[in-house]
């Protein structure tokens, strides 16, 4: 069954997303650091969840570098490929994990995110939370540089506001 969602603009970007997205924390194939809270799931189940979410009308998936050390992002890519979905069919949001890291690490991290999610584009790249060895201002400056290189479509923050 497909629900009819009115799509909304993602922040100030031209990207349109449904009001409900699919969270991909569990798509980490046993590499999830936090199995005490909930268990990660296998590839077959991940593929089915992604397929059913898109059939239901959801057009974006939220994942992060920190979810299974990139395994969630790879699972999202495989699930989208298994469902024969193209880059424009689903929007992808992922996040940089800044804890105990410096803003100068962002370019290296985005290269890994791009590889993990290939062949799909990153529609939204976010700072996952505000705690870092670098100020949020320095982190955002690096995010803007990456956006200006057209490696990602938009930038933002998660779990805090600017």
Task: Describe these PLM feature segments.
Residues 64-66, 95-97, 130:
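Short strand-loop junctions, especially beta-strand C-caps/beta-turns
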Residues 33, 38, 100-162:
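Glycine/proline-rich, positively charged
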Residues 1-90:
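N-terminal binding-site loop/beta-alpha segment at the start of enzyme catalytic domains
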Residues 79-82, 94, 143, 161:
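Residue-level signal for alpha-helical context at structural boundaries
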Residues 26-27, 97-99:
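Short, solvent-exposed loop/turn segments at secondary-structure junctions
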Residues 17-21, 59-60, 89-95, 121-126, ...:
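Structural preference for beta-strand elements that scaffold enzyme active sites
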């Amino acid at each position: 069954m497909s629900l009819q969602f009115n799509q909304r603009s993602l922040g100030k970007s031209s990207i349109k997303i449904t009001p409900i997205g699919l969270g991909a924390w569990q798509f980490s194939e046993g590499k999830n650091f936090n199995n005490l809270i909930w268990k990660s799931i296998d590839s077959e189940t991940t593929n089915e969840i992604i397929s059913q979410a898109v059939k239901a009308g959801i057009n974006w998936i939220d994942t992060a570098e920190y979810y299974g050390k990139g395994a969630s992002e790879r699972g999202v890519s495989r699930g989208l490929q298994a469902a024969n979905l193209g880059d424009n069919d689903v929007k992808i949001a992922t996040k940089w994990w800044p804890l105990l890291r410096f803003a100068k690490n962002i370019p290296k991290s985005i290269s890994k995110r791009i590889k993990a999610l290939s062949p799909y584009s990153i529609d939204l790249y976010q700072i996952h939370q505000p705690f870092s060895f670098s100020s949020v201002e320095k982190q955002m400056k690096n995010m803007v540089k990456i956006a200006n290189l057209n490696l990602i479509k938009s930038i933002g923050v998660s779990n805090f506001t600017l």
